C-alpha cells in the first residue's frame, strides 16, 4: 500500500500547493509511482500541471459526491511520470451538498482505497481552510500530514488552530492521525525574522521539522504559469534543488532507498 500524506495549512500563501506539486514531481523523478489529489476548489494544483480545470471530465468533486470512482478520472503525465486526480471550481459546492450525507468525512479515504495499490505515494493538496474538504483530506492521511509553513510572522498565528483541528480529528474520526513533518518555505536567510520563525516552529513541532528548507525562489513562482513543476522548468534553480533534497529526505525517512538517477537537464532559467 502507498504512503498517503496530506498537505495542510489553513493559511493561504504558505507554499502548500507549490510543495505538493514539486515534492510529488521529485518523488516521481526518483522512481516512485505518485498520485497527486487536488482537493482545493481553486484547483491550483490542477492548473499548475497544465490541466484546464474548466474542461476536465471529472475530478474530486465527482468522487466525493459518489458520481464516479476515482480511477477513470485520474490523469497521467507521461513526461513527468506523475498522476493527478484533478479539481474544478464545482468542488466549492461539495461541502453544502454533503452536509446531510452519512460518513461524509470518510468519502475521500474510501474512494482512494480502490486505486491505492497502483501507487507508492499519494499526496493530497487541501484547500486553505478547515472545512469538510480538509477533514476528508485529514481522515485520508494514513501516514500523516505535511505542514508547509512560510517563514514569516503571520504564518505562525494559525499553527495553534491547526494543532487543535488535528487533535479534534484524532478524537472524533482518526486516532492514528500524525504529523509527518513541517516544511519551512519562502526562507530568506538575510532576515532575522526568518530565523526566529524557524525557532518558533521547532517549538510547536519538536523533532518534526524537515531539515530541508525551501528558499524564496522566482523560478518556483514562475513555473505554474508554464504548467509544469520547477523540475521541468528550471531544474538548476535553488528552488528545484531544495525540493529535490526534500524528496530525498522524505524517502530516506520512510526507509525508501533513493536510486542513482541522471541529473535533470540544464536550463537557462537558473538563480
Q: Model regions: which residues?
A:
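P-loop NTP-binding core
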Residues: 1-271
Amino acid at each position: 500500500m502507498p504512503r498517503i500524506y496530506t498537505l495542510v495549512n489553513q493559511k493561504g500563501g504558505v507554499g502548500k500547493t507549490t510543495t505538493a506539486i514539486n515534492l510529488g514531481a521529485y518523488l516521481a523523478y526518483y522512481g516512485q509511482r505518485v498520485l497527486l489529489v487536488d482537493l482545493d476548489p481553486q484547483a491550483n494544483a490542477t492548473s499548475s500541471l497544465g490541466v484546464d480545470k474548466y474542461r476536465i471530465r471529472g475530478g474530486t468533486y465527482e468522487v466525493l459526491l459518489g458520481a464516479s470512482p476515482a480511477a477513470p478520472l485520474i490523469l497521467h503525465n507521461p513526461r513527468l511520470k506523475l498522476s493527478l486526480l484533478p479539481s474544478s471550481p464545482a468542488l466549492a459546492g461539495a461541502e453544502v451538498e454533503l452536509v446531510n450525507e452519512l460518513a461524509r468525512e470518510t468519502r475521500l479515504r474510501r474512494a482512494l482505497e480502490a486505486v491505492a495499490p497502483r501507487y507508492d505515494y499519494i499526496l493530497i493538496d487541501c484547500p486553505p481552510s478547515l472545512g469538510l474538504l480538509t477533514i476528508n483530506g485529514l481522515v485520508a492521511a494514513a501516514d500523516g500530514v505535511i505542514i508547509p509553513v512560510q517563514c514569516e510572522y503571520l504564518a505562525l498565528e494559525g499553527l495553534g488552530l491547526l494543532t487543535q483541528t488535528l487533535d479534534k480529528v484524532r478524537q472524533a474520526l482518526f486516532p492514528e492521525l500524525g504529523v509527518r513533518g513541517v516544511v519551512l518555505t519562502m526562507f530568506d536567510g538575510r532576515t532575522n525574522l526568518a530565523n526566529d520563525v524557524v525557532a518558533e516552529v521547532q517549538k510547536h513541532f519538536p523533532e518534526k521539522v524537515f531539515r530541508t528548507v525551501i528558499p524564496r525562489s522566482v523560478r518556483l513562482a514562475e513555473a505554474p504559469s508554464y504548467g509544469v513543476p520547477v523540475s521541468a522548468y528550471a531544474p538548476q534553480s535553488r528552488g528545484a534543488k531544495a525540493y529535490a533534497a526534500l524528496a530525498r529526505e522524505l524517502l530516506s525517512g520512510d526507509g525508501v532507498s533513493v536510486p542513482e538517477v541522471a541529473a535533470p537537464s540544464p536550463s537557462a532559467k537558473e538563480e
